């Protein structure tokens, strides 16, 4: 259900410095539930499949739609990538083709003692190097993103990251054809750091039988990377990778609920149902910071500090208990959506889970209203993971 709503991000959002959070995106005007505030195409995309994967990627190596079993074009030069159309095949540059061929020839021995993630990082670097040659202006945008690759000035950079950068730079510089641009070890480290903190995963199709979905591809979206994290976000991202329309790899950012002018707009960097300790561990390891959002402050104060929200959500499936929560916490939505803490409640974000968490099995997606077509907000909520829609029963009953 793609609808860009005529969004003009330069009029809807502005960059601001917020104490303790750094560069942030805040509402430049009042934003409405369901409003599309940003639609962005990727700066680059790359496959999430390792070179030595036992399974062949079923996706086009440019747009990452599912390939039709009979109608796809395989590169005859490297035999390593397939495309769904001549237009997608045209994106496969001679340098990238030859680099993939050479790297694949040496991959069995080169990556034998390396984790599989190292092969995916190599894919990113090849895409980044290719961007440097094909579009220097876009490469400069990539370089402007957060992530320095230096353990001294980059909290997300670890000793393991530095070792990975050294290994990959040595391997690729010895295997790949020369480029018209110079790639130094420091630049390679910086690129890997930028990928680590800015890449967004494009997921495989949702399935009830597949509780842990895999990523089909990663993309760099410069404007979207400006959004800070909050464990109770007021916006969420949608993508429609398998749609037949143009721009299928675009990321669409949509408001979950109304936000006043001047309020920071935040995304959650992972499924909202994760418990406190898992969230903190992932944020520290992947992004280099400890979250102290309103939800984390409340959960930290709990006696064990690591309540499993999945169990809480299962308990909330009881209808009487759910209605009681809606009555007690549904009066002021903004207080429980990253905007404040109700000190009188042991679980102040219950309202968010009741209204904005997808209830389908093994989904764990976030619900947001469809883009409003009139002055009134839509009463239909869409899941950003499984794509299902439902009537906003909680909002209707307010």
Curated annotation (Swiss-Prot):
It catalyses: L-lysyl-[histone] + S-adenosyl-L-methionine = N(6)-methyl-L-lysyl-[histone] + S-adenosyl-L-homocysteine + H(+). One of its GO terms (cellular component) is chromosome. One of its GO terms (biological process) is methylation. Its EC number is 2.1.1.-. It is an enzyme of class 2 (transferase). It comes from the Eukaryota. Transmembrane segments: none annotated. It is found in: Nucleus; Chromosome. Pfam families: SET. PROSITE patterns: SET. Keywords: Chromatin regulator, Chromosome, Methyltransferase, Nucleus, S-adenosyl-L-methionine, Transferase. InterPro entries: ASHR2-like (IPR044238), SET_dom (IPR001214), SET_dom_sf (IPR046341). Gene3D superfamilies: 1.10.220.160, 6.10.140.2220, SET domain (2.170.270.10). GO terms for molecular function: histone methyltransferase activity. Histone methyltransferase. This is Histone-lysine N-methyltransferase ASHR2. It comes from Arabidopsis thaliana (Mouse-ear cress). The gene is ASHR2.
């Amino acid at each position: 259900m793609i609808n860009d709503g005529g969004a003009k991000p330069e009029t809807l959002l502005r960059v601001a410095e917020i104490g303790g959070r750094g560069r942030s995106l805040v509402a430049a005007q009042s934003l409405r539930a369901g409003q599309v505030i940003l639609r962005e195409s990727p700066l680059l995309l790359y496959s999430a499949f390792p070179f030595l994967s036992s399974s062949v990627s079923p996706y086009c190596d440019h747009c990452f739609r599912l390939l039709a079993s009979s109608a796809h074009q395989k590169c005859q030069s490297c035999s390593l990538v397939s495309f769904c159309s001549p237009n997608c095949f045209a994106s496969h540059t001679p340098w990238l083709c030859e680099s993939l061929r050479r790297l694949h020839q040496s991959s069995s021995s080169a990556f034998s003692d390396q984790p599989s993630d190292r092969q995916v990082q190599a894919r990113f670097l090849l895409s980044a190097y290719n961007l440097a040659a094909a579009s220097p202006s876009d490469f400069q945008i990539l370089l402007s993103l957060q992530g320095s690759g230096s353990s001294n000035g980059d909290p997300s950079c670890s000793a393991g990251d530095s070792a990975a950068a050294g290994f990959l730079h040595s391997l690729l510089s010895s295997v790949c054809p020369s480029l018209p641009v110079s790639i130094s070890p420091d630049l390679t480290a910086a690129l890997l750091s930028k990928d680590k903190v800015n890449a967004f995963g494009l997921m495989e199709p949702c399935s009830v039988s597949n509780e842990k979905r895999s990523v089909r591809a990663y993309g760099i979206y410069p404007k979207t990377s400006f959004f800070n994290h909050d464990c109770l976000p007021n916006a969420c991202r949608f993508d429609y990778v398998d749609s037949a329309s143009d721009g299928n790899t675009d990321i669409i950012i949509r408001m979950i609920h109304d936000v006043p002018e001047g309020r920071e707009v935040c995304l959650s960097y992972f499924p909202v149902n994760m418990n406190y300790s898992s969230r903190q561990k992932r944020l520290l390891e992947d992004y280099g910071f400890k979250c102290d959002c309103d939800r984390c402050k409340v959960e930290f104060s709990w006696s064990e500090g690591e309540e499993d929200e999945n169990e809480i959500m299962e308990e909330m499936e009881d209808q009487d208990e759910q209605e009681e929560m809606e009555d007690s916490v549904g009066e002021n939505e903004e207080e429980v959506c990253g905007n404040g803490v109700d000190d009188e409640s042991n679980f102040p974000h219950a309202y968010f889970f009741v209204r904005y968490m997808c209830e389908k099995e093994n989904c764990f997606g976030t619900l947001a209203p469809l883009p409003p077509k009139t002055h009134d907000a839509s009463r239909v909520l869409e899941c950003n993971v499984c794509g299902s829609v439902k009537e906003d029963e909680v909002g209707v009953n307010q």
